[in-house]
């Protein structure tokens, strides 16, 4: 499955900063999980859908420049807190507040 540029940009930035992340993408959603120091997980998500012409991204608000960002309360819990659309650079600022493992 093709990965959106915004997700690739985020993952490159995380790698450049040596910030660990996990790919939890599914059939119709790109998910980048970033474990936080407090045991929570920051989930950065881009939804997409498949058409007869191929993969279309952009179900996420703010796409193509932003990802939906939510807190997951544990690795086993898919219940999201309120999400917000953020650029990869804004996500790094959020990580500065929460700290990463």
Language-model regions, residue ranges each:
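Ampiphathic alpha-helical segments that act as solvent-exposed interaction surfaces
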Residues: 6-10, 64-101
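Low-complexity, intrinsically disordered/propeptide-like segments
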Residues: 13-17, 39, 45, 70, ...
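Amphipathic, interaction-prone secondary-structure segments
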Residues: 18-66
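Amphipathic alpha-helical segments
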Residues: 5-20
């Amino acid at each position: 499955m093709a990965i959106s540029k915004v997700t690739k940009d985020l993952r490159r930035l995380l790698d450049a900063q040596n910030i660990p992340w996990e790919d939890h993408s599914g059939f119709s959603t790109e998910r980048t999980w970033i474990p936080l120091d407090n045991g929570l997980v920051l989930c950065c998500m881009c939804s997409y859908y498949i058409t007869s012409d191929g993969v279309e991204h952009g179900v996420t608000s703010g796409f193509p420049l932003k990802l939906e960002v939510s807190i997951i309360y544990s690795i086993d819990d898919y219940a999201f807190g309120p999400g917000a659309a953020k650029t990869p650079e804004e996500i790094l600022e959020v990580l500065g507040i929460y700290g990463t493992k």
